[in-house]
């Protein structure tokens, strides 16, 4: 803090001895030591406060930068969402128009001269029906029946 060498300290001690006197010199030296300690604590407190404020300012700047980047990303996402929304609305409108026009086209199907009228499929699907087996009725076990426990 102070650049005081050994010789300068001896000169200060001799001057203090002459000015204060030998009886009061220990009390004055003790008081000067206490004042010097208080001054050092005060200086260290001020340094730590300044350091803390600088860190706080830096954190505020980082927070503001982060907030700006998040806001810009959010606005970009909102822009993309509005573009997609506009595109989807256009597609829905186009599909709506095509669905509205389709019933009109379905009411008047195109007639062709060579086209045969469509005949419904009248074939009936036959399912095989099995006659009950006489052996099963007599009590013989089959491979598909369950055995009693």
UniProtKB/Swiss-Prot annotation:
Pfam families: TatA_B_E. One of its GO terms (biological process) is protein transport by the Tat complex. GO terms for molecular function: protein transmembrane transporter activity. GO terms for cellular component: TAT protein transport complex. Gene3D superfamilies: 1.20.5.3310. It is a single-pass membrane protein. It is found in: Cell inner membrane. Its main location: membrane. The chain crosses the membrane at residues 1-21. Residues 101-111 have a biased composition (Polar residues). Keywords: Cell inner membrane, Cell membrane, Membrane, Protein transport, Translocation, Transmembrane, Transmembrane helix, Transport. The keyword DNA repair does not apply. Belongs to the TatB family. This is Sec-independent protein translocase protein TatB. It comes from Thiobacillus denitrificans (strain ATCC 25259 / T1).
């Amino acid at each position: 803090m102070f650049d005081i060498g050994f010789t300068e300290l001896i000169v200060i001690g001799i001057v203090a001895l002459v000015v204060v006197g030998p009886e009061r010199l220990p009390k004055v030296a003790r008081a000067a030591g206490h004042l010097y300690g208080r001054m050092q604590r005060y200086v260290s407190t001020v340094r730590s406060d300044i350091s803390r404020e600088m860190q706080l300012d830096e954190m505020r700047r980082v927070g503001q930068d982060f907030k700006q980047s998040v806001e810009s990303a959010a606005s970009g996402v909102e822009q993309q969402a509005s573009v997609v929304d506009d595109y989807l609305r256009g597609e829905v409108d186009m599909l709506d128009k095509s669905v509205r026009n389709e019933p009109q086209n379905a009411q008047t199907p195109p007639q062709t001269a060579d086209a045969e009228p469509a005949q419904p499929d009248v074939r009936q699907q036959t399912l095989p029906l099995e006659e009950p087996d006489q052996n099963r009725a007599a009590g013989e076990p089959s491979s598909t029946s369950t055995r009693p426990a």
